[in-house]
Amino acid sequence: HIGALPYVMKQIDCPVYGTALTLGILQGRLKENGVGNENLRVVKPGDKITAGAFKLDFIRVNHSIPDAVAIAINTPIGTIIHTGDFKIDHTPVDGQVMEFNKFAEYGDRGVLCLMADSTNAERPGFTPSEKMVGQTFDEEFRYAKHRIIVATFSSNVHRIQQVIDTAIKYDRKVAV
């Protein structure tokens, strides 16, 4: 989702805010495109910044990639919340639970606009915790007699870590 930023940053000279992992990934893209990284600003959940008349509040959410945040944009006419893509996971692998309390606080105060993005949100039911995937890996690694092939997004760092941890547990080799 950050592939366009090197092109935008060539045209617009302004600060670019992101969490450490996001900016780390972006730095590789910038280098590939000959764009400097002096405008990058690291933020973390709980950070607040002011940009002109806007006050931004970064709120922890869960997603397949670690270090994800939503942004509450407090404007003179009301608050806009942009969630980015997120997943509700009450038991995330890294223990960093989504800040439900912050969303509730903003809800109590009133939100002008919620821009929410959650893959498969239109499907009924819920998505199990990423920890459940780890338990499935454990079962597969325990009983598999031959090679195991796992496909995942490269950004799904927690899933990749669970594969590696499970492979170590069962004395298996990992090839990426």
What do the PLM-derived regions correspond to, one by one?
Residues 1-176:
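His/Asp/Glu-rich metal-coordinating catalytic cores
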